[in-house]
Amino acid sequence: MRWGHHLPRASWGSGFRRALQRPDDRIPFLIHWSWPLQGERPFGPPRAFIRHHGSSVDSAPPPGRHGRLFPSASATEAIQRHRRNLAEWFSRLPREERQFGPTFALDTVHVDPVIRESTPDELLRPPAELALEHQPPQAGLPPLALSQLFNPDACGRRVQTVVLYGTVGTGKSTLVRKMVLDWCYGRLPAFELLIPFSCEDLSSLGPAPASLCQLVAQRYTPLKEVLPLMAAAGSHLLFVLHGLEHLNLDFRLAGTGLCSDPEEPQEPAAIIVNLLRKYMLPQASILVTTRPSAIGRIPSKYVGRYGEICGFSDTNLQKLYFQLRLNQPYCGYAVGGSGVSATPAQRDHLVQMLSRNLEGHHQIAAACFLPSYCWLVCATLHFLHAPTPAGQTLTSIYTSFLRLNFSGETLDSTDPSNLSLMAYAARTMGKLAYEGVSSRKTYFSEEDVCGCLEAGIRTEEEFQLLHIFRRDALRFFLAPCVEPGRAGTFVFTVPAMQEYLAALYIVLGLRKTTLQKVGKEVAELVGRVGEDVSLVLGIMAKLLPLRALPLLFNLIKVVPRVFGRMVGKSREAVAQAMVLEMFREEDYYNDDVLDQMGASILGVEGPRRHPDEPPEDEVFELFPMFMGGLLSAHNRAVLAQLGCPIKNLDALENAQAIKKKLGKLGRQVLPPSELLDHLFFHYEFQNQRFSAEVLSSLRQLNLAGVRMTPVKCTVVAAVLGSGRHALDEVNLASCQLDPAGLRTLLPVFLRARKLGLQLNSLGPEACKDLRDLLLHDQCQITTLRLSNNPLTAAGVAVLMEGLAGNTSVTHLSLLHTGLGDEGLELLAAQLDRNRQLQELNVAYNGAGDTAALALARAAREHPSLELLHLYFNELSSEGRQVLRDLGGAAEGGARVVVSLTEGTAVSEYWSVILSEVQRNLNSWDRARVQRHLELLLRDLEDSRGATLNPWRKAQLLRVEGEVRALLEQLGSSGS
């Protein structure tokens, strides 16, 4: 997986649009603002505000208050109510934004966008070539602050109309929301009254006539009594017209007549035209935002200043954004209060790793040039490293990201087809993405891109749509490759976006072979005329003795079935390719897909296996995950809002084809990372019935060595927690589990018969969760392995509370858990509280003779205990002999294993002991292990010297050889 930039957008509410983005510029600095309105706030409680500017250019502190233009108390109160309503309205954040915590709001902290002034000559130049279209804005153009937009121009003329333009995702909606909130909180003192309009809202009114006063009064009720005074406000009245591309404006007098009366009913587009002509309210200030393709809808003579909304022009601004985002106090807290909040140290670590990757990985820096991709990076990191809200998937993050940027957007409002911008992107960019996945490449030449964009274009209207897409949205999806040796090529802005769009291209049914296209047309034609022809042929067959007619009659019926089977075969082929990609074993990228995604964002700590030889074969393991995720009901509903509906029947048939292939390949034993990818696919699909059927044959869950982050624990618990059949074994050894992960995985543990939690650094705190697990009435665990965890005596005291009330556990391993004498004495005192235990392993716990002997005696008296492991403890020669004698003293009672020998014979448990040593050789203290092995070797030599039985001597010699080999291995690895 590899790496690109923008900030998202959502609706303002009923008819308005809003976004969540914060662009900026080069040298950020902080300004702490105070309230300018007569020394007091316009409304609301005190609120700290920090502004991070995108440029070093800033205006002076707000000047003193102008003379009041609305002198009456009632008018002042009406405007104050208007401020309060706007602030409440524009402060609302979409659900996707709220997951970052309530403190990240536009009225408390903000990174100002970079706005670079441009000229009409630049806008009228011919469109740049594809390669140049993706270049950042020229550094020489002066940046503008929000407060400077209406400053006099270079000739000293007053600027009344400002047009701000930017491609999809540069943050036009967020800029408008921020500007409105600035005015609400008194930070734009130059304007007495601000009236925002959404052009999308106005376009939805159609040709129904309404006056400007009616439009304002309908949307902002408190302003009814201020409307007669609007003309007197002059330049202190600011209209904000957001999303001009949604309106069809005609500035010809023949098309739109002149009108200066704000109370005269007209079409909404005519009102906007006369406002921009300065024929209606000629002194009012107007701010317009639009996509680049619609700039020409306003003649340049009516515009005082053009400004391009740009992205984060250097990595310092990107770092600032990430610090603000990821260091929010509630950033790591799960929705609904579940899970554990990320600590400040963990958040700082994420920011530091991301900063290092931004400095060393130029492609991700190029991606984050667009602020909305910075949002996507933060959302992905939040998903990967924080407790995940129920139902949130990686696919839903990407789908929501596209909804925030494309919701309600049509490609061209003047085109009668009203084609969705996202639907056009799915058809063109999806084709390019899928061709890249199928040919296993992520770099595309200009010919590749043009080939997908221009495929099938035949009419002038289609070329016009392509031109609009290239100007408004192409660089949202594609970025120039900045890697050495890749000049002139393009990559998808974010690597995962290629796989998402490829999956979308498939599930939307846009990939069709020539045979399928022809077959579909033939089948539809036959279907339309088939009934009539069949009726005629049926009559003729009865009247005329023609034997060929029944055959022809049946052939007509067969044609739709043949086409249906052809489509079904195509779906099966896609499912086959998807499943093969999911279970494809890689030599280089063998981490699970979530770790791969995290590494692509944060970088890889430490050297790669082959630093000078990157893999030639690209990995597209997210592609099948996104395919499953896009078929989920939630994502299909969001895609329908974007103009990309997936039919229920198509989703069902695709799911059935995938299930058929998964049922065959899913039965094989998978490596831990591949098994997690399999479970992650089911998590993305969000269909419990589907997952239960496919995973019904899963009996062993082996995720040993997989780093179980909060999201991975959530994935495993969500997919396997609701299953009914028992799991023979759950192996989570060396998974970096913590108590929060144990709590998340509780539903899975309740299905397990054998549970392995070795090498997880679980301490006494985790024993509380293990106690609750053992006391659960559905617990069916028979074997519990907790070796190589620092449980200590305090943890075992808690664990014994669970064992006292548990009736299922028969085998318990506490090998190398730091129990010491205190822990073994505690076990000896409370062992009789459990009546089912059959085997107890407390080897390598640093216990002495007294504690070990006490536990051995308690074990001998236990009604069910059969085996007690005490080897590798700090036992003297006399202590070992006493324990050996105790273990074989009488019939019945537990056998005590303290050495590789039993008298003059080899212990039948010698292989168990040595295999434990071999398995933990790299994690145990080498000097201590070497000392214990030397003691065991001495026991073997003594036993061999004390026996005359040649068979026993041979066995002892064999075991001696195994011990010596381990000692040599210790010595060589130590050196």
From Swiss-Prot:
Residues 556-974 are annotated as: Required for the repression of MAVS-induced interferon signaling. Homohexamer. Interacts with MAVS. Interacts with TUFM. (Microbial infection) Interacts with influenza A virus protein PB1-F2. The keyword Metal-binding does not apply. Residues 75-556 are annotated as: Required for interaction with MAVS. Ubiquitously expressed. Strongest expression in mammary gland, heart and muscle. Detected in HeLa, HEK293T, THP-1, HL-60, Raji and Jurkat cell lines (at protein level). The LRRCT domain mediates homodimerization and LRRNT mediates trimerization of the dimers. The keyword Transferase does not apply. GO terms for cellular component: cytosol; mitochondrial outer membrane; mitochondrion; plasma membrane. Its main location: mitochondrion. It is found in: Mitochondrion outer membrane. This is NLR family member X1. Residues 906-970 form the LRRCT domain. Participates in antiviral signaling. Acts as a negative regulator of MAVS-mediated antiviral responses, through the inhibition of the virus-induced RLH (RIG-like helicase)-MAVS interaction. Instead, promotes autophagy by interacting with TUFM and subsequently recruiting the autophagy-related proteins ATG5 and ATG12. Also regulates MAVS-dependent NLRP3 inflammasome activation to attenuate apoptosis. Has no inhibitory function on NF-kappa-B signaling pathway, but enhances NF-kappa-B and JUN N-terminal kinase dependent signaling through the production of reactive oxygen species. GO terms for biological process: innate immune response; negative regulation of canonical NF-kappaB signal transduction; negative regulation of inflammatory response; negative regulation of innate immune response; negative regulation of interferon-beta production; negative regulation of interleukin-6 production; negative regulation of macrophage cytokine production; negative regulation of RIG-I signaling pathway. ATP binds at G166, T167, V168, G169, T170, G171, K172, S173. GO terms for molecular function: ATP binding. Residues 160-483 form the NACHT domain. The gene is NLRX1. The lineage of its organism: Eukaryota, Metazoa, Chordata, Craniata, Vertebrata. Gene3D superfamilies: P-loop containing nucleotide triphosphate hydrolases, Ribonuclease Inhibitor. Residues 667-694 form the LRRNT domain. Keywords: ATP-binding, Host-virus interaction, Immunity, Innate immunity, Leucine-rich repeat, Membrane, Mitochondrion, Mitochondrion outer membrane, Nucleotide-binding, Repeat, Transit peptide. It comes from the Eukaryota. LRR repeats lie at residues 695-718, 724-747, 749-777, 778-801, 811-834, 835-857, 858-877, 878-899. Residues 1-86 form a transit peptide. Belongs to the NLRP family.
